């Protein structure tokens, strides 16, 4: 039987505020047994010591555990992305899937988890291959082939002082001893893993470390986010399949730089969300289920020839600058601030740019966004 995906975009008052999800469970909009993934933008710093992410995971486990059983919690991918700089609004994206009759094509969703990653493998080819295997497993679960995939969301681990120390104690050498740098290395390897699984980057082009890989080789349909709250990888694949039904559709674009909105506008236009003035209008916003994007400060320190200071600010990490900057540009286009914009786009789109995915309801389709 075909399957049907649903998405609820819900507000949060704090990282541990699951009241909106709980209300959706009570009123029947959401069946706990159908939930396959929960994404969130939490109001931490998005760096190594952002504990809003594990706090949110703890709250989710406390909500769903009594409903589906502790043993079943592992089948829900909990992808927390810290950082709501600028006007970004903290929010939840709850993704569910169930059997349902009806015509396709429609949004298809699959998720998978990898084994735990050894600290010494982070940022190296072993991590790339591990994530590639996870992406392939999620594609199989969704019934998608590489050409049908529009976006892959990966949550990957980072290195802490304790994890580095444990690796050194057993005679292993991590790729870095810098915990903040480890986030970028992990995101890079995760993105290359997705690109490998999707056929965007050949295996021969990937070095033994991400530093040995040409940055011109990058994923075009992946967003990777690193966090302290896990040791493995959570992988969620989204695409369009004739074997899925329902009102949801997905499309994607790639921004060439931080202000490159034309591809995003074209994507929104293909989904019928733009008004006559070229911006998402009220009717389009009612149909917008989710927007996911990656943001990165360009390595050359400039945007279209004009200098930026995101890389030279000693007070604020460049990922935080980029997240707020790109989110503002996208929010102006769509007229909404509860967008899943994630900083740190290593090997995710071209330098300074990044992939964007838009999920929408077909015109005339009812349902909460």
UniProtKB/Swiss-Prot annotation:
The active site is at 155, 225 (nucleophile). It holds the Pfam family Amido_AtzD_TrzD. It catalyses: cyanurate + H2O = 1-carboxybiuret + H(+). Mg(2+) binds at residues 296, 345, 348-350, 353. Its EC number is 3.5.2.15. InterPro entries: AtzD/Barbiturase (IPR014086), AtzD/Barbiturase_RUA (IPR043008), AtzD/Barbiturase_RUB (IPR043006), AtzD/Barbiturase_RUC (IPR043007). Inhibited by barbituric acid. Homotetramer. This is Cyanuric acid amidohydrolase.
